Swiss-Prot record:
This is Kiwa protein KwaA. The chain crosses the membrane at residues 10-30, 46-66, 117-137. Disulfide bonds: none annotated. The keyword Transmembrane applies. Its main location: membrane. Keywords: Antiviral defense, Cell inner membrane, Cell membrane, Membrane, Transmembrane, Transmembrane helix. The lineage of its organism: Bacteria, Pseudomonadati, Pseudomonadota, Gammaproteobacteria, Enterobacterales. InterPro entries: KwaA. It is a multi-pass membrane protein. Component of antiviral defense system Kiwa, composed of KwaA and KwaB. Expression of Kiwa in E.coli (strain MG1655) confers resistance to phages lambda and SECphi18. GO terms for biological process: defense response to virus. Disruption phenotype: Cannot be deleted in a Kiwa-containing strain of E.coli. It is found in: Cell inner membrane. It comes from Escherichia coli O55:H7 (strain RM12579 / EPEC). The gene is kwaA. GO terms for cellular component: plasma membrane.
Length: 195
């Protein structure tokens, strides 16, 4: 159960990777000087004026870690496979997440520390809601890297048919494909087409 929650939190952080990059671009204050009388402002001042971009950079590094973890997750199960009996694209969910939760942050001001704390709390609350409602799979960052979402029914030789699941895959899936799988929870799994 803890691994499932860890994976869900990781997918949510990964879904915010673009937001972290945009915030870094919007808020980084790195002084540039092209004259001969330039001097370094000091590491302490540089860090204190760039707290928000530094925090976003750390979370961006976490998102890279979770992306690499996700890419390798189906290697845990290279033996057991299921057959897809019904398949429908759900990739529009990524655009919904992008338009609803990431784009509005672009207009926010990050100058006031109280607002930054409120923004952080908002992102945490949205993450909790996404994880509790199992919408954490709607991930625009994965869409950029070629992952697709599918609503599928699967047939497992030992346990029969399971309906209405979400498959996340880098492959194009269709009915009658056999896929290796690794479940995040009861309804969402990573799929890799069996060759």
């Amino acid at each position: 159960m803890q691994r499932n929650t860890y994976n869900k939190v990781g997918l949510y952080i990964l879904s915010l990777a673009m937001l972290f990059v945009f915030i870094i671009i919007l808020t980084a204050k790195i002084p540039f000087c092209f004259t001969s009388d330039c001097s370094f402002i000091g590491l302490k001042k540089l860090v204190l004026t760039n707290i928000v971009p530094i925090v976003c950079f750390v979370f961006f590094l976490f998102s890279i870690y979770f992306y690499n973890r996700l890419k390798n997750i189906t290697k845990y199960n290279g033996q057991d496979s299921v057959k897809i009996t019904s398949c429908q694209s759900e990739s529009y969910e990524s655009l919904t997440f992008l338009a609803t939760y990431i784009v509005p942050f672009m207009g926010f001001s990050f100058e006031d520390m109280q607002k930054n704390i409120a923004y952080l709390l908002l992102v945490v609350v949205i993450g909790i809601i996404f994880i509790k409602t199992d919408k954490y799979y709607a991930n625009p960052t994965l869409a950029l890297f070629g992952f697709k979402l599918y609503r599928v029914n699967i047939l497992h030789p030992g346990s029969g048919e399971t309906k209405n699941l979400i498959a996340i895959s880098n492959d194009v899936l269709k009915v009658d494909d056999n896929v290796y799988y690794s479940f995040f929870d009861e309804f969402v799994f990573i799929a890799r087409k069996k060759i």
